[in-house]
Swiss-Prot record:
Residues 1-28 form the signal peptide. Glycans are attached at residues 41, 61, 64, 78, 92, 100, 122. It comes from Amblyomma cajennense. Salivary chemokine-binding protein which has chemokine-neutralizing activity and binds to host chemokines CCL2, CCL3, CCL3L1, CCL4, CCL4L1, CCL5, CCL6, CCL7, CCL8, CCL9, CCL11, CCL12, CCL13, CCL14, CCL16, CCL17, CCL18, CCL19, CCL22, CCL23, CCL24 and CCL27. This is Evasin P991. Keywords: Disulfide bond, Glycoprotein, Secreted, Signal. The keyword rRNA-binding does not apply.
């Protein structure tokens, strides 16, 4: 008796599919659900610059409890030049000033905000210093 019920249900399903098609076939007739992403030529799925900029940007410490900030608004990650987002806080230091920083808070650093890769000073200064693990 049970096998008859299963057979009848399968037969009904087969007739339904034969008459109406599958839901995927209906989507294909409407032009939906059939396109595959072109992984070789598409940038819709990955921001390749973000993917290449996976190294942490070197940041400096400060004495007033605000967030640590990078020296300028760009850094190199492997061979990629990485840029901090606009309005990101930064220190506007010359290369000479940055090289002479120590792990003690002895340098008054100009604070700014990034704008298209440039640290634009905002008129404030704070003592900044290298984190002990900051590479040269």
């Amino acid at each position: 008796m049970h096998s008859t019920i299963v057979y009848a249900c399968l037969l009904a399903l087969a007739v339904f599919v034969a008459l109406h098609g599958t839901p995927l076939a209906a989507l294909a007739e409407n032009g939906e659900g059939t396109t595959q992403p072109d992984y070789d030529n598409s940038t819709d799925y990955y921001n390749y610059e973000d993917f290449k900029c996976t190294c942490p940007a070197p940041h400096l410490n400060n004495t007033n409890g605000t967030v640590m900030k990078p020296i300028g608004c760009y850094y190199t990650c492997n061979v990629t030049r990485c840029t901090a987002p606009d309005t990101y806080p930064c220190y506007n230091l010359t290369e000479h000033q940055a090289k002479n920083l120590t792990t003690s808070p002895t340098t008054l650093c100009a604070v700014g905000n990034c704008d298209h890769g440039i640290c634009v000073p905002n008129g404030t200064k704070e003592l900044c210093f290298k984190a002990p693990n900051l590479e040269e």
